[in-house]
């Protein structure tokens, strides 16, 4: 199922929520929104078309309609169809058709003392809710807090974020054993990135076969052990570039890389700019 991928922070902004009912034979009106429209069907079936693609959204399912795309009822409801709706705003997003249970697109970008960590928030454009009671509770609270005299305005945003994260968690479940191995490997590499750690070293430290460790990291984190180590090294390199006057050779050696030329090449490959350019940009920000 195609997905919509957001990069957070900042998180998408909640606007409003409500509920409604389509009577038997009634269709959804034709319109184009400037914001996202999340519709969760409680009972019945909603027949809706977005951008010339038709969907049947049954009870316990949701559909996420995108800004700028025309949507309308494909045909009338077969029975009374009750639903919740939620509008939120976010301009930075992309459509992707990749994978279903692979977390590679959700990979965390580690932050530093000057830069925020970045995460992926990805939702299928249509999905089945596994915990309908939780969804109903969140929507009811959002509707209550949307009342005119609500004294908890910030709670709406928190409830909305909880709802979105829950939908993502349901859509991207990872076997706990693989997840545990992947994060154990990640922690080990974070602690030993300055060393010449091989996949064999990692395997011996975790007491798992080399292929299994590598496979777990790729499925859960979307990177190989070597790629993860290099990301950790580049994060530390950025910290050193922004907080010290050390030469490239010293920084390369500090993060566990003997060849300054290869260090610079890898830094540009991962970060998009050279270490020298990065230092200049950071220096201008400080000034």
Curated annotation (Swiss-Prot):
Highest rank taxon of the organism: Bacteria
Residues in the DNA-binding region annotation: 200-221, 248-271
Keyword terms, alphabetized: DNA-binding, Transcription, Transcription regulation
An example Gene Ontology molecular-function term: sequence-specific DNA binding
InterPro entries hit by this protein: AraC-bd, Homeodomain-like_sf, HTH-like, HTH_AraC, HTH_AraC-typ_CS
Domain HTH araC/xylS-type stretches: 183-281
SMART domains in UniProt: HTH_ARAC
Protein name: Uncharacterized HTH-type transcriptional regulator YisR
Annotated organism of origin: Bacillus subtilis (strain 168)
Lineage: Bacteria, Bacillati, Bacillota, Bacilli, Bacillales
Gene that specifies this protein: yisR
